Amino acid sequence: MSTFFQKQQQVAALDPRLGGLMASAGLYNLKALIKAIRSCKTLADERSLIQKESASIRTAFKDEDPFARHNNIAKLLYIHMLGYPAHFGQIECLKLVATPRFTDKRLGYLGIMLLLDENTEVLTLVTNGLKNDMEHSNMYVCGLALCTFANIASEEMSRDLCNEIEKLMGSSNTYIRRKAAICAMRIVRKVPDLIDHFVDRTQQLLSDKNHGVLLCAVTLAIEICRQDDEALTVYRRAVPLLVQHLKSLVTTGYSPEHDVSGITDPFLQVKILRLLRILGKENAQASETMNDILAQVATNTEASKNVGNSILYETVLTILEIDADNGLRVMAINILGKFLSNRDNNIRYVALNTLSKVVSMDTNAVQRHRNIILDCLRDGDISIRRRALELSYALINESNVRVLTRELLSFLEVADNEFKLGMTTQICLAAEKFAPNKRWHIDTVLRVLKLAGNYVREEILSAFIRLVCHTPELQAYTVQKLFSGLHQDFSQESLTLAAVWVIGEFGDVLIQGGNFEDEELVREVQPKDVVDLLSSVLDSPYVNGLIRQFVLTSLAKLHTRLSDASQQSRIEQIIASFETSVEVEIQQRSVEFATLLKRSDIRQGVLESMPPPEIKQTVLGTVSEAKPVGSTRSDKDALLDLMGDEMPVTSGGGTGADNAPSGATQQSTHDLLADIFGGGDMGGMPSAAPAASASAAQKPKSSVNDILGLFGDGASAPAAAAQQAPTPAPAATSSYGGLDLLGGLGASSSASTPAATPASTVAKSHTVYTKHGLTITLTPTTNPARPEIVHITARFTSATSAISNINFQAAVPKTHKLQMQAISNSTVHPDSTETQPLRVMVPPGAAVRLRLRIAFQVDGHSVQDQTDWAQPSA
């Protein structure tokens, strides 16, 4: 750095004027400053140099030397680009703009754009200078002013200079017109009230022959359409003109001025396609006008280079957004399928992302590319794997559930941990929804538990247990499989929980099941083997508090299910060993179970098999990437979920017991559990009282007294009072809020009453279409626990002849979210009814609104129609 100062002194000795200038302004020019900064060895040296140079520049500004001002502003802007403060040069930039020299104006405007923003107070001083330069005879000076305006204009400046910008949009100079159009876009964004000033001007510019002006005009039109829906009507009249522009770009020969990789002006083509997409949305006439040119672009554009791919991608988005023909939509999806075979990861990503959005529109067309989508699961790019997974979930249906599930399970073995929670959830939901039979369903969930048992949500685990309880013909098979799986691996928490629960509940079935194959070996399970396995679980390094709770309950149940006295004694010893546990819940269970097992007169009734809980569809919220089960599960919620409860689900994926549920949901939950357990008060819920009272009245007095006096002495008087009360005494309390896996102390299954479940609200069917012999009705269904989700069943019937090739499409407003499944059969016969499920998520309190498009063939004629439907208010 010292060499620069030496040269500085040498120059000063040769020319006193330059020496004085350098003395006041530090280094002589920008080039010298850059070299000096680059030669600094440390950051401290650079800061010291910048500080000294900034001080010299600040001092030089006081001399009002025009030559020095230009030089100092150039150095100051470089200092600003390095991240150091340079705000003290703002006024000097205004002085440069006021000079007549073009070079000074150029540097001054550059400084204004860098040092000022729309919130700076100094900006108000710039307005007059911009107005004067916009009227300058030199188009380059005018261009500088327009460029500055487009970068920093505030709302006030936009209002002040709106008329000047509108006037310049009609200039005869193409250079000025295109810059004025960009300035108009800035005004439209800042002050939407001024849109009316530019609608007509923009429409005139859309007829311009200059590609630069046309590009800016189309960009401005896009912004106006986004800001003002009324402008859509005006610009839709220009659709034929835009189609003509696009056609000339596609069919024109080689144009050196606009050619990019053999394609004429791809930037303009993309902008026109984007504007056509906006204008054609929800407008059949405009869509019909652009169908042919879109097909031409999709067919003739070369896809060997990224330039062509960008145009094809924009074309696909346009086709999918407008009311295009079915053939055109299939072509668009096929283009996306070709993108999946591209080597460029970016192209494959956007293809997967777009297919995920359109799979509900035309599932069959996307299904054709299923193999390529599955290949993307093995891609090295994690983002592509994630998008391929999401798309694979959407493709699962009754016909391909076996194939896709097999592929997903294969990928689950090698998937990253961050994918496993979502995968286990989606695989199990697909198995629940599309399983060809219950054995395949059970095998699939068992496979999931073995592969990723630490990444299974508690809702999935409880749904699996409900399934086992409701499938008595497969209980022996399931308990044997779980016994074998747990014997091989203790590390998968959900597998351990499921196996322990099922073994405890169906231990007698396991013992009586006889021989079964285990790893190509035939084995027979003895009572000792069962107790040994559960004891090994308690001693394993993977055990936690929740597993201990499950094992203790399972052992207590096995005590009544095993006839081997030695194993019963061993179970009592294992349970008693936890009476001094430091975990309160474990200690409490151990003491209660130990006391219960000594009461031979009641333990058989207390520990008898539970009645199967009500089976229902698993309802999940947003899949969280957090730990799914065990550590994230509260003890109180575990049993509620296990018994089929539908507590509100938070976005984190856990149950909503800690979030105050609505009264209706909470009441229904307690009613359900009260019936399952044979009539407990469950916290004194009013609606459960009648059933509980009736249940209590049927029980012998001695049994009630025994239950109430189970863990205390002298309970006869309270017992009599409890028997006469309208509600029975609650079950023994635990961290489950009065509920236990025992199935209710003393509550027999015969006393259970029909479960009062949260009833779904079913609206009457609404006929939305009746033409050409085809009748379509919609039946919306909502669940009080999830009122924002509306399940709609579309039913198709034919009055006369067969109707084929039915293509039923639906669109919703931006505030709704729609999922559609495939129709049960695309051909409707007069004696049949076909269905197609829809799932709509709406904002709270909003009604469902659908725009329906129906295409079909009847008597050899193709019919295409459209109708709107709004859900009537309740």
Swiss-Prot record:
Keywords recorded for this protein, A-Z: Cytoplasmic vesicle, Golgi apparatus, Membrane, Protein transport, Transport
GO molecular function: clathrin adaptor activity
Pfam families hit by this protein: Adaptin_N, Alpha_adaptinC2
Gene3D superfamilies: 2.60.40.1230, Leucine-rich Repeat Variant (1.25.10.10)
Keyword Zinc-finger: no
PROSITE patterns: GAE
Function: Adaptins are components of the adaptor complexes which link clathrin to receptors in coated vesicles. Clathrin-associated protein complexes are believed to interact with the cytoplasmic tails of membrane proteins, leading to their selection and concentration. The AP-1 complex interacts directly with clathrin. Required for apical growth extension.
Assembly description: Adaptor protein complex 1 (AP-1) is a heterotetramer composed of two large adaptins (gamma-type subunit APL4 and beta-type subunit APL2), a medium adaptin (mu-type subunit APM1) and a small adaptin (sigma-type subunit APS1). AP-1 interacts with clathrin.
This protein's name: AP-1 complex subunit gamma-1
Organism of derivation: Mycosarcoma maydis
